[in-house]
Amino acid sequence: MKYQKIKNVEKPLSKIIFGCAIPVMIQGEDADELLDEVYAQGITTFDTAENYGLSETSLGHWLKNRGNREKVVIISKGCHPYDGRDRVTPENLKHDIEQSFERLGTDYIDIYLMHRDDLKVEPGSMVEILNEYHKAGKIGAFGGSNWTHQRIAEANQYAGEHGLIPFTVSSPNFGLCDQIGDPWGGGPGCVTISGPSNAEARAWYRDNQIPVLAYSSLGRGMFAGLVKSNDMEGAKKILDPNAVKGYCYPENFERLARAEQLAKEKDCTVPQIALAWILNQDFEVFPLVSAKKASRIASNAKALDIVLAKEEVEWLDLRRDRR
């Protein structure tokens, strides 16, 4: 495993982050054995959220039983809408942070993210609350998940004008598998920086040196190794409806075909190529990966050792016809 420090977080993050939105944890079941195995792979950073069912409770159970809170980095999120009701308000933010403390069994969260945005809300009000918790030592870095780079810039302008800590981290969708449709929809919805239409966003992250925590890094399973590039109809049977809505488009099957070809040439797997593509970007990015078995995480982590040439990165993403 490789590790990297980011601003306002005392401990280094593992370059691959384990996503805790998996059935066993969402249902609040005992995931200690799985988390032990993931941790043994060197993964020390775990992503969860207030609205991931009982995921925080399951993670907190493991932290308590193993006594390793000081050795791991916790990412959690709040202010997700419920029943079509936007919840990006100071009151909901405070409620969700406090509830996460209780569920996780901790008095601080290393990285806290606004899970969704509400364009009707001035971001400065969120910046004020997050700074209160940061000043009290209850959260480290903070930022947005599914916030556009323009909205983050707006929040950071407010922070600069008022002498406050700005957003220093962001968690949009990012991966070789372009999120062409919104998997969940509703409101401002999901934000992606993948694909040809989001080159400006990626340049902004590079220029502003804000690290990206990339969710759905394998396209909700489309680039996880089971889907084949020559079988779109079969993919629709393998993937969940949200993944089909977000990722099952001809462009992504062409990307998958190229990933299959390169994986064969480099004697590795499709998910390893897809993760290596993320890790070989020209900006700071940490892919989030989930799995029901730690062996898959161990396999995926080998992507850290794969070096891709710039021409290969561009070819995989359909930005050039030849390598």
Put a short name on every predicted segment:
Residues 1-73, 135:
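N-terminal binding-site loop/beta-alpha segment at the start of enzyme catalytic domains
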Residues 11-16, 42-45, 68-72, 106-110, ...:
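Short, well-ordered coil/turn segments that N-cap beta-strands
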Residues 18, 48, 76, 111-114, ...:
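Conserved beta-strand positions
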Residues 19-29, 78-92, 120:
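Active-site mouth loops of central-metabolism enzymes
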Residues 26-38, 88-104, 153-157:
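Short, acidic/polar
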Residues 70-83, 170-174:
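A short, structured active-site edge motif that brings together acidic residues
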Residues 101-122:
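Active-site groove signature of glycoside hydrolases
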Residues 121-323:
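Beta/alpha (TIM)-barrel catalytic core signal, keyed to glycine-rich beta->alpha loops juxtaposed to Asp/Glu
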